[in-house]
């Protein structure tokens, strides 16, 4: 059996906000170091680090390797950076589980990191030289993170098409986003995230600043949500508020087997019951989590109503709405502390972040079974089922 010994994350900073002076490896290092320490392990106990990062341009070689070494792990620890777009962090956990099952590793730190604030602009054709005419500057964040590779259409346009197809109104999506924001504000104000967040110390000319709570929920103005202009279509229903926020952050989980945990005297938080990937046409990425959840439910033998809590990443409000409607879920069990519409969506981290949040939410509420799922650009989705120990 695969178990999760510890699970932490940094706070999420807004775009060009509180964490914008930190690189992705800087943030990843903070999460890795704390996860290992909380697990009661020594840095030398970790066999490998598998970390997601979607926007690596300009970060130099091996972002996961950089984060691992900054975290104080020895040079003998392997490190792999993976890119499955929004699913990178969750896929890292899945690959960690696979490696442990295969016997190629005993203890793995898995997770993800992103500094969307520091994603560079790229000079196309600069290597060959600009002989004549106009050149082009490409936004690394947009091209690699937020646009369909084949069509160049933004994820928002494709999401808007699905929202239109499913008949989701502006009012329905705004109502969902407002609910998410209210939940997030309540969670921040009541300290619900304290158990999962590791503080990040940011140095500035004015001295060190400790960032230990998500930046965006308390800055949002709920009364302005209904007044925002459509973001992707003149008469569209998706806005900046009922879509996820561009942000920075990292998350890390210590993954091992039940046997190794027992041998080392570790106290696991949860067991990994099942995980799955679902893939379909790229334009249908927003509904792909429904298929991933179906696969996980089949593997576990659980019924949807048996699941105590759900984390469905709110890349757009309508993604979570599709999952809720697809399985007739109780909305009070979905993203109980708010989701990406309110908290943020640092691409490489979100997949692991929602697992971290799910574990701690189950602990706080006395639940046991949980499922986390998220959509992925390119028409994919991943889902994972966990059960507290």
Segments from the language model and where they lie:
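Active-site pocket-lining segment
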Residues: 157-160, 196, 203-204, 273-342
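Short, well-ordered amphipathic alpha-helical segments that serve as non-catalytic structural scaffolds
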Residues: 24-40, 63-67, 92, 155-162, ...
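Conserved beta-ketoacyl condensing-enzyme motif
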Residues: 20-108, 112-131, 197-211, 284, ...
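Flexible glycine-/small-residue-enriched beta->alpha junction loops
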Residues: 107-161
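N-terminal extracellular/periplasmic Venus flytrap/periplasmic-binding protein-like
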Residues: 9-10, 21-30, 38, 172-263, ...
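Conserved catalytic cysteine-centered active-site region
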Residues: 53-107, 149-154, 219-245, 326-353, ...
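Active-site-proximal alpha-helical scaffold in enzymes
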Residues: 82-114, 163-192, 252-259, 324, ...
